Swiss-Prot record:
<dbReference type="InterPro" id="IPR020587">
    <property type="entry name" value="RecA_monomer-monomer_interface"/>
</dbReference>
<dbReference type="InterPro" id="IPR020588">
    <property type="entry name" value="RecA_ATP-bd"/>
</dbReference>
<dbReference type="GO" id="GO:0005829">
    <property type="term" value="C:cytosol"/>
</dbReference>
<keyword id="KW-0238">DNA-binding</keyword>
<keyword id="KW-0233">DNA recombination</keyword>
<feature type="binding site">
    <location>
        <begin position="65"/>
        <end position="72"/>
    </location>
    <ligand>
        <name>ATP</name>
    </ligand>
</feature>
<dbReference type="InterPro" id="IPR049428">
    <property type="entry name" value="RecA-like_N"/>
</dbReference>
<keyword id="KW-0234">DNA repair</keyword>
<dbReference type="GO" id="GO:0005524">
    <property type="term" value="F:ATP binding"/>
</dbReference>
<dbReference type="GO" id="GO:0003684">
    <property type="term" value="F:damaged DNA binding"/>
</dbReference>
<protein>
    <recommendedName>
        <fullName>Protein RecA</fullName>
    </recommendedName>
</protein>
<comment type="similarity">
    <text>Belongs to the RecA family.</text>
</comment>
<dbReference type="Pfam" id="PF00154">
    <property type="entry name" value="RecA"/>
</dbReference>
<keyword id="KW-0067">ATP-binding</keyword>
<comment type="function">
    <text>Can catalyze the hydrolysis of ATP in the presence of single-stranded DNA, the ATP-dependent uptake of single-stranded DNA by duplex DNA, and the ATP-dependent hybridization of homologous single-stranded DNAs. It interacts with LexA causing its activation and leading to its autocatalytic cleavage.</text>
</comment>
<keyword id="KW-0963">Cytoplasm</keyword>
<dbReference type="InterPro" id="IPR049261">
    <property type="entry name" value="RecA-like_C"/>
</dbReference>
Length: 342
């Protein structure tokens, strides 16, 4: 760069630092690029599909899907994983439908969970912003965007038209909250519902509520669907679930994964560990028998899962090795990352 231009630039940078504080602007080369910290989703396959081992901290994430597809279950699983690593979590329950007994079954420490059941959409988003600005929250969940009802709509008559009120509310709130989320290094998850666009002849008629702002501000968008049932004989014990990474600003997008959500216990993580272990050759499968490091661990998948449940050290080592292979990091790095997050 020309010497005069360099001098002028340095003067401008110093002026900006004096006026707005150090670090307001910087050269990308001055700071070493760091890996984006992530919170595990509780699903090994989804952590891998996201490319960084989970949902990114300091970013906004949108999870949407039809009713009973596992949206709230997935977010509660994220909260449980964050709490396991010592994080503080908050749940803004705009739907007034959080079941603490179910949350506890999924591994959530409900005694430490901060819960708000706001009266209006404005109150919900103001509470969310204040919690984020405290800098003490690691994971914030808003359930759901569709239930963020503007005050004018609540106070109005049943048949009144309030065109675009919710979309304007979301747009204004996200403009305000995005920078705070980044500064606080907080993972903010917005759960959303699906609606049908009327009169769409070609293409996908589905859309999400609350306007387009959330689509733009989200670093990750997940589309979650129930694709079948998990049965034990004739009894339905869970759901087969498919998640597509529709948008991803932190890794390559458009990946998808499938896993089981078992009623009362949540995501069948050990089942995923065994499936990926067989796929990558870390677990040997001969007929119905599963073996790990030459030792038989069970006849049939359910018995192998039971073995891993009883031998958590073996399960953890196997999971670390799988993460190392699937996420492209060395085994030592995977173990170090696990230790650091704890």
């Amino acid at each position: 760069m020309d010497a005069n231009k360099e001098k002028a630039l340095q003067a401008a940078l110093q002026q900006i630092d004096r006026q707005f504080g150090k670090g307001t602007v910087m050269r990308m080369g001055d700071k070493e690029l760091e890996a984006i910290p992530a919170v595990s989703t509780g699903s090994l396959g989804l952590d891998v599909a996201l490319g960084i081992g989970g949902l990114p901290k300091g970013r906004i994430v949108e999870i949407y899907g039809p009713e009973s597809s596992g949206k709230t279950t997935l977010t509660l699983q994220v909260i449980a994983e964050a709490q396991r690593k010592g994080g503080t979590c908050a749940f803004v329950d705009a739907e007034h439908a959080l079941d603490p007994i179910y949350a506890a079954k999924l591994g959530v420490n409900v005694d430490d969970l901060i819960v708000s059941q706001p009266d209006t959409g404005e109150q919900a988003l103001e509470v969310a912003d204040m919690l984020v600005r405290s800098g003490a929250i690691d994971v914030l969940v808003v359930d759901s965007v569709a239930a963020l009802t503007p005050k004018a709509e609540i106070e109005g008559e049943m048949g009144d038209h309030h065109v675009g009120l919710q979309a304007r509310l979301m747009s204004q709130a996200l403009r305000k909250i995005t920078g705070n989320i980044k500064n606080a290094n907080c993972l903010a998850i917005f759960i959303n519902q699906i609606r049908m666009k009327i009169g769409v002849m070609f293409g996908n008629p589905e859309t999400t509520t609350g306007g387009n702002a959330l689509k733009f501000y989200s670093s990750v968008r997940l589309d979650i669907r129930r694709i079948g049932s998990v049965k034990d004989g004739d009894e339905v014990i869970g759901s087969e679930t498919r998640v597509k990474v529709v948008k991803n600003k932190v890794a390559p997008p458009f990946k998808q994964t499938e896993f089981q959500i078992l009623y009362g216990t949540g995501i069948n993580r050990l089942g995923e560990v065994i499936d990926y272990g067989v796929k990558l050759g870390l677990i040997d499968k001969a007929g119905a028998w599963y073996s790990y490091n030459g030792d038989k661990i069970g006849q049939g998948k359910n018995n192998a899962i039971q073995y891993l449940r009883e031998h958590s050290d073996v399960a953890q080592t196997l999971e670390d090795r799988l993460k190392a292979e699937l996420l492209g990091q060395s085994f030592d790095e995977a173990v170090e990352a696990e230790a650091e997050s704890e």
